[in-house]
């Protein structure tokens, strides 16, 4: 209450009611004041109750008060004559007659106005019905808005889920980048190791070429010696034909020459073995070069692909970040719009309650009005109130139209958000596909790493074999043999072989025996046949059992040199313990 004006405030608008001839003034939106609204509502109800009681009292007084006699006379006239109850020649009564006529005209005008007011009241009722229907439509729109709000909440939950998935993808991409960096470092290490292996192979090849050059010179010298021996043989044959007396000397010389020929044959065999080993080494080196070229090409392709994939991944991540930021902004705008819609909905509900209260009061007052004067007074007051309410309803309709436009804007924003979510889902699928490709590339890189490791192991094995071949090792049947030039006792030779991770040679087949005989000539070599610890039960030192059925018993105790063993197994004698000077040995690996 402020003087003669009454103010009603909602969350963001205030309406003031003034006395007659003063219109309602719509004040500027004020800040929400819930305590003032709580205080104004009881005051408004009290004022409405007092106004209704006063109106009821006036109506009762109008019904109980008798009509003045002059007015009855004016209205009804004389019951007998039907004329006015005054004399025409009386000037005083003539003036009263004019006044009464004027009063009658005024009353008729009021009656006509009352009929017009009845029409306006009917129009107001129609408008009230229209307002009720519009309020029902507004309630339906509010229900649809609530459904849209629930749908927006679901979309926001989906957006939250997408943001979590995007964070997971970021963490997986960071792990993938770290794995790619580690693989790059491994590739650099592999390239460095390959370069070192290449240098080692080049140096080994140079050494091999030098040794082959030396061997070729030795072969040339051997060929010249063979030619000289052929000439000597021709001379010896001529001398044998000419003189039988020199036959013994010639036979002796031939025997010596045959020994030289055996040496030459051994040299030829060694030369052939070296040539085969060299050809194999050249083929392996060529294969290694091709493998290195393929590995370098594959490394370059892999690096280019990984770089392009990383660039594409970074661009897509930036793109996703931008979209997520825009989605966050749109979600913030939607939240703000939802808050505005909620506030406007509450305001509309308050106005609807006020409108219902006003309509109920209007109906009760319309039922209680019985006289024309009371109807005029009440209608004047209610016309003003109705105009105020109409203005309020118009403002509510404007707000409803604004709410409808905001609802449409929310629908469009929801459609945009749905399209954005669909596009984000597509981007997520693309990111998943990219992750699968990265995993495939990682598996390929792991396979390449395994291949490179196996190639490095093969290169190391080949390098070791090449070094062993260059050091004088012989290859036969998947095993390597080393014919020593240092003489030791059998026990010392065995201990040396065990310290090198090998053992004295064992004869497991006729082919192996033939191979060993080919390189031993007339020199004794220790082999790994022994009965130490098991008197009379012979065995090989590498654990291979000695087959007594296929081989004849070696004889008495002791370890047997190779030539003795061969003689024993040919049935030419027995292998006994030999107290001779130390012999060289055959190392088998």
UniProtKB/Swiss-Prot annotation:
Main location per the UniProt record: membrane
CDD domains, alphabetized: CLECT_DC-SIGN_like
PROSITE patterns from the UniProt entry: C_TYPE_LECTIN_2 (PS50041)
Record key words, sorted: Endocytosis, Glycoprotein, Lectin, Membrane, Receptor, Signal-anchor, Transmembrane, Transmembrane helix
Gene Ontology MF annotations: carbohydrate binding; pattern recognition receptor activity
Transmembrane region(s): 40-60
Matching Pfam families: Lectin_C
Sites where a glycan is attached: 79, 113, 207, 230, 244, 312, 385, 399
Subcellular location: Membrane
Ranges where the C-type lectin domain occurs: 476-589
GO cellular component: external side of plasma membrane
Cytoplasmic side: 1-39
A biological process term (GO) from this entry: endocytosis
InterPro entries the record matches: C-type_lectin-like (IPR001304), C-type_lectin-like/link_sf (IPR016186), C-type_lectin/snaclec_domain (IPR050111), CD209-like_CTLD (IPR033989), CTDL_fold (IPR016187)
Extracellular side: 61-589
Topology term for the membrane: Single-pass type II membrane protein
Coiled-coil regions listed in the entry: none
Protein role: Receptor with an affinity for galactose and fucose. Could be involved in endocytosis.
Name the record gives this protein: C-type lectin domain family 4 member F
Species for this entry: Homo sapiens
């Amino acid at each position: 209450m402020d003087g003669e004006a009454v103010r009603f405030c909602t969350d963001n608008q205030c309406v003031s009611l003034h006395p007659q001839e003063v219109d309602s003034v719509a004040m500027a939106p004020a800040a929400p004041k819930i305590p003032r609204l709580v205080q104004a509502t009881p005051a408004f109800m009290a004022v409405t109750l007092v106004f209704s009681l006063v109106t009821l009292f006036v109506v009762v007084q109008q019904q109980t008060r008798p009509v003045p006699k002059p007015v009855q006379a004016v209205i009804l006239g004389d019951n007998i004559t039907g004329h006015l109850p005054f004399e025409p020649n009386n000037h005083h009564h003539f003036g009263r007659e004019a006044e009464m006529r004027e009063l009658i005209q005024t009353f008729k005008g009021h009656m006509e106005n009352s009929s017009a007011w009845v029409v306006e009241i009917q129009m107001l009722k129609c408008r009230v019905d229209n307002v009720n229907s519009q309020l029902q439509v507004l309630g339906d729109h509010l229900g649809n808005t609530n459904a849209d709000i629930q749908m927006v909440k679901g979309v926001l939950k989906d957006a939250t889920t997408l943001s979590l998935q995007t964070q997971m993808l970021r963490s997986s991409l960071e792990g993938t980048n770290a794995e790619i960096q580690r693989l790059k470092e491994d590739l650099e290490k592999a390239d460095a190791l390959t370069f070192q292996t290449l240098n080692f192979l080049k140096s080994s090849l140079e050494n091999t070429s030098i040794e082959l050059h030396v061997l070729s010179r030795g072969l040339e010298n051997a060929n010249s010696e063979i030619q000289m021996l052929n000439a000597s043989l021709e001379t010896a044959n001529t001398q044998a034909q000419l003189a039988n007396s020199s036959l013994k000397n010639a036979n002796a010389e031939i025997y010596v020459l045959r020994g030289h020929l055996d040496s030459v044959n051994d040299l030829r065999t060694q030369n052939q073995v070296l040539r085969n080993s060299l050809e194999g080494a050249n083929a392996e080196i060529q294969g290694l070069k091709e493998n290195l070229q393929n590995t370098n090409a594959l490394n370059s392709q892999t690096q280019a692909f990984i770089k392009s994939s990383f660039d594409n991944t970074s661009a897509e991540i930036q793109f996703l970040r931008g979209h997520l930021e825009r989605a966050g902004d749109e979600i913030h705008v939607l939240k703000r719009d939802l808050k505005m819609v909620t506030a406007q909905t509450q305001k509309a509900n308050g106005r609807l309650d006020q409108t219902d209260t006003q309509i109920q009061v209007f109906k009760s007052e319309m039922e209680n009005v019985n006289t024309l004067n009371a109807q005029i007074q009440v209608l004047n007051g209610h016309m003003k109130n109705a105009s105020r309410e109409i203005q309020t309803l118009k403002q509510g309709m404007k707000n409803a139209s604004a709410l409808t436009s905001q609802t449409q804007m929310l629908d469009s924003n929801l459609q945009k958000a749905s399209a954005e979510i669909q596009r984000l889902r597509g981007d997520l699928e693309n990111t998943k596909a990219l992750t699968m490709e990265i995993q495939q590339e990682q598996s390929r890189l792991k396979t390449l790493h395994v291949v490179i490791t196996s190639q490095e192991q093969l290169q190391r094995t080949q390098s070791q074999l090449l070094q062993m071949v260059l050091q004088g090792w012989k290859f036969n049947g998947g095993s390597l043999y080393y014919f020593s030039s240092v003489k030791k006792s059998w026990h010392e030779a065995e201990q040396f072989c065990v310290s090198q991770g090998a053992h004295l040679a064992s004869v497991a087949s006729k082919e192996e025996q033939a191979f060993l005989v080919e390189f031993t000539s007339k020199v004794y070599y220790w082999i790994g046949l022994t009965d130490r610890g098991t008197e009379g039960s012979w065995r090989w030192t590498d654990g291979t059992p000695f087959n007594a059925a296929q081989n004849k018993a070696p004889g008495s105790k002791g370890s047997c040199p190779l030539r003795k063993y061969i003689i024993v197994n040919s049935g030419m004698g027995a292998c006994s313990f030999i107290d001779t000077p130390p012999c060289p040995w055959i190392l088998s690996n």
